[in-house]
Amino acid sequence: MKKTGYFLLAVIVIVAATGVGYWKFSGNPDALREIVLEQCLPDQLQHQNPAPCAEVKPRAGYVVFKDRHGPLQYLLMPTYRINGTESPLLLEPATPNFFWLAWQARGYMSKKYGHDIPDSAVSLAINSRLGRSQDHLHIHISCIRPDVREQLDNDLTRISTRWLPLPGGLMGHEYLARRVTESELAQRSPFMMLAEEVPEARDHMGRYALAVVRQSDDSFVLLATERNLLTLNRASAEEIQDHSCAILSSR
């Protein structure tokens, strides 16, 4: 009976998880890809106009796009087909360091806001295969939740340069945390750090979500959470973000 109960619970969780989507593009999981490949990229190449994207960099291989959810949220996406965290392309040395590029694009938030936004209020996040509803790699550039910001501030000295469990997790889910310098982040992709340093991660990258947050000592914290349906964790690192940017009103 116990085994049957666990099985039914797992089925319910899977159905619920796959039925929840963040994007509402008429159920089209390729909506973002179509925007990038059929609108932004052609407009830039043919007319030197990135619209509807905010920026298109064909040679560097990425675009920046204003997300319609939240006043300041942007997305960084590749100009070619990469589905998400499960893609082996992310572990190729020639692939752009998309997280570093996303961090460089944070200035779009300040420009939209009309004032400088402190780095401590910004976060980057990418969801797992099950934690997303769009099948084109996209890194969310948005505000961090105030409570997550406070927790990471309190854990500043306890976060190691190795991947270790974050005490207490975040948002009720288990997270691994790793501290890196700005130079490390610029030179090495967080996807590669996760795949090469966390046992068995390389073979199951699609199960993971990743986030990047700046700390008060100018280091960065990499955060990773792995899908676990029995604990209702779809591995959506976007959960540490607040697209309403309440953290800005408290400063």
Swiss-Prot record:
UniProt GO MF annotations: CDP-diacylglycerol diphosphatase activity
The topology of this chain with respect to the membrane is:
Single-pass membrane protein
Per the record, the GO terms for biological process are:
CDP-diacylglycerol catabolic process; phospholipid biosynthetic process
User: To which pathway does this protein belong?
Assistant: Phospholipid metabolism; CDP-diacylglycerol degradation; phosphatidate from CDP-diacylglycerol: step 1/1
Family matches, as InterPro entries? CDP-diacylglyc_Pase, CDP-diacylglyc_Pase_proteobac, HIT-like_sf
Q: Name one GO cellular component term.
A: plasma membrane
Which positions, given as ranges, span the membrane? Answer: 5-25
Q: What keywords tag this UniProt record? A: Cell inner membrane, Cell membrane, Hydrolase, Lipid biosynthesis, Lipid metabolism, Membrane, Phospholipid biosynthesis, Phospholipid metabolism, Transmembrane, Transmembrane helix
Q: Where in the cell is it found?
A: Cell inner membrane
Q: Which reaction does it catalyse?
A: a CDP-1,2-diacyl-sn-glycerol + H2O = a 1,2-diacyl-sn-glycero-3-phosphate + CMP + 2 H(+)
What SUPFAM superfamilies does this protein's entry cite? HIT-like
Q: So what family is this one in?
A: Belongs to the Cdh family.
Its name, as the record gives it, is: CDP-diacylglycerol pyrophosphatase
Q: Which organism is it from?
A: Salmonella paratyphi B (strain ATCC BAA-1250 / SPB7)
Q: What is the lineage of its organism?
A: Bacteria, Pseudomonadati, Pseudomonadota, Gammaproteobacteria, Enterobacterales
